[in-house]
Structure formats: C-alpha cells, structure tokens
Amino acid sequence: MPQKGNPSPNKQPATPKNMNLHVNHRSYALPRQPVVVVCVDGCEPDYLGQAVANGHMPWMKGVLAEGTGLVADCVVPTFTNPNNLSIVTGAPPSVHGICGNFLYDSASGTEVMMNDPKWLRAPTLLAALADAGKKVAVVTAKDKLRLLLGHQLKGGICFSAEKADQTQQAVHGIEGVLEKVARPLPSVYSADLSEFVFASGLWLMRHHRPDVMYLSTTDYIQHKHAPGTPGANAFYAMMDHYLGQLDALGCVIALTADHGMNAKVGMDGRPQVIYLQDWFDCQWGAGRCRVILPITDPYVVHHGALGSFATVYLPEDVSPQQACDRLMQDQGVEVALTRQEAAARFELPADRIGDIVVVSERFTVLGSSEARHDLSGLDAPLRSHGGISEQKVPLIVNRPTPGLDTRRRWRNFDAFDLALNWAQ
C-alpha cells in the first residue's frame, strides 16, 4: 500500500519546540482535532487489499488514494497484549514490559496472565494525554486488555465490549453502555464483539467528542476466515462503514494491527503442530523443561492455545545453545534463540522470557503437550499467529503526510506519532 499524494519539501513534522508531551523518550503534539487510533486485531494487510479490490471498502479505497498507506512491522511475539501495549506506549516490550498474554513468574513459580497493570513498566500515552487535560476514551473488545490500557487513566472512559453490561461511572467513566449504544451484549466469539467496539466509538464521538480515542477489536473473524472470503469481506465492510462515519465527524484516524494471521495447516488441512513439551520431555526427561506459550488467554476456542512463538525454561545442566541447535534441525522451526539473542532481536525484556525462544515457520504452530490442547472447538482450518511470519501489518492514516520518509522501517507503535505529529 504505497503512500499517495505529492510530498512537499515545505511540510515539516512536529518538532520538540511545538510538542507538549514527552512519553517514553518520544515527543508528541497535543491533539488539535479528534484523533482515533484503531488496532484491528489480526489484520493481515491482505484482508484490506482483498476487501478494497472487491469493492467492500469504499472509504478505505479513498484513504489509500488520498491519505497515507504503509506496511509496518509489529512486535514479536505477534500477540495481542504486547502489541496493544506497544501501540499505546509508543515503545517495544523491552520498555513497557508486556512480552505476551501469558508468562512464567519465576518469583512465585507460577504461570500467570499478563493482564494486571503490575506488569507494566512504562506509562501509556493515553494516561499522559489525560494528565495533560485531554478527554480520552478507550474501548476494547476483550476485557483482558482493559486494565492495562486504562492504567492510570484519570477522568477518562475505558470499558470493554465483552463486559459492556457491567459499566459503572466510578470504574469505567461511563454507565449504561448497552442502552446508549442501543445494541445487545455481544458474544465474545462473534464478529458482533468488534462491531460493538466501533458502534461504541461512534456513539462516544457523537456524544462525548473525546480528544483522543483508542479502539481495539478482536480477531475472531480473522482466525476463522481467510482474506477475500465472504466472512472476512463482510467484517471489513462493516468496519469501513463505521470508519467513514468517524471521518465525516472530522476525526484523524490512524489504523494499524497487533499482528497478522496465517493458515497453520498442512496440505491435508490438519493443524501442523510441534508439541514442544513432548519434544523436550523426550530429549531431556519428563518435566525437566518448562514450555510457556504466550498466546494463552481465556479465549482459546478459535486457536486452541496454539501460536507460532514459545519460550522455554531449562534445567541448569541443559545448555541453551545446545537446545537451540537441536531445535533448528526440526522441520517447522524458523528460529531458536538464546534469551540474550531473543531479547536483542525482538526487543523483549530478558528477565521475562525463558532460557530460549522458539519461533515456528509460517504454516506451523507450537504447542506444549498434545494431551493439553483441545482442538474440538475448531470448526475451520486452524489460522493463528505469534511468529515472524505474522509481523507485517497495515499502518494507515486518513490524511496525507507530505515529507514522510516511507522508506524507513515503520512500526505499528508509530501510529500515535503519525496521527499526532504528521496528520494534524
């Protein structure tokens, strides 16, 4: 998606002199018009390409012609929590600390979800904007992100579509969301969950007009439907409809994704899985190594807790380099790295990953033990994410950005930079 328009040498990006906000070693201009940043969960760029080409996204077609369209890299592991937090902090996991949906807490010796703000090591831009006196609203599809995205958000609105029936003024900054949006509570396993996010965002912009709004969807559709299929095109047509209405209200819109999505099956259509816990048990004895799958969250029906990234804790007598060398001999493994190598390559907090990191190839996922994964909920060929093969994501702004260096490596966590510093 190349950038359209004629870059002007007279256009200058915002500089520290006219910026009012400094967060995580980056500077931002304060919003002068409503800014909406959208994270479309699982949005492989081809979803947009197919939907636009087949006439399902007229608004997006116009934006790509007149605005800014880039392909960026998200962070690895290509999962929801680390990338959403990268977007709202403007920084990689090595700065904000959220390295997965799930981790092994070595201090307590337990495996835990990374939903608690205690794991966050950096302030969010959303909280900083609220502290600067700006009206901030956050709507996320799944409630697992709400506390992280809303951390230290003073006076703002922050709720999830999943639990929109439980909103309270004192907790979420708003109440009676179902009545206000005039939609029923959606199922967490449906496209309706994401549509509720967009409908809520549109209602908030019409009735509260926040200065900055962050919308984060769910990838239920992307896990089930490939780009260009009727199910996928219907989802993106719905999204296009809401984004067009937000645009008509005068919003600067920056759209990106937390990760892409790929089929993870063999030619027979069956899931192509490397069960790492079984592999390590066979190599070095049962239970001596601990495999952690950072994709793990409460919503496993559509992916079976199978993703393309894993981290492994080894006993002292097992050399990390030896383990990596053996893994690299296995078909389906793209890369196996020691802790130090993985932290440097993927910008991860070294103290929150195992002794080694394993990333599988595009059509392969990583599991723990075969007996621990229930794939009975899969009613379509497995599609998932987590690896390097899901790193490419769209980065789109509904405004031209003359002077922008489109040749540099852009990241999904540059979304607020583009919206606040270039598009206004």
Q: What is each of the regions a protein language model found here?
A:
Residues 11, 16-18, 88-226, 232, ...:
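His/Asp/Glu-rich, glycine-adjacent segments
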Residues 14-68:
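Active-site-proximal N-terminal segment of extracellular/periplasmic enzymes that hydrolyze or transfer
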Residues 32-49, 63, 87, 129, ...:
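Beta-strand elements within well-structured catalytic alpha/beta cores of enzymes
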Residues 33, 40, 78-79, 102-116, ...:
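Secreted, luminal/periplasmic, and some membrane-associated catalytic domains
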Residues 42-46, 65-71, 79-83, 101-114, ...:
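Glycine-/proline-rich flexible loop or hinge segments
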Residues 42-45, 77-78, 93, 142-146, ...:
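Short, solvent-exposed loop/turn segments at secondary-structure junctions
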Residues 49-90, 137:
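Short, structured active-site-proximal loop/turn typified by the sulfatase FGly-forming signature C/S-X-P-X-R
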Residues 360-421:
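Low-complexity, glycine/alanine/valine/leucine- and proline-rich hydrophobic stretches
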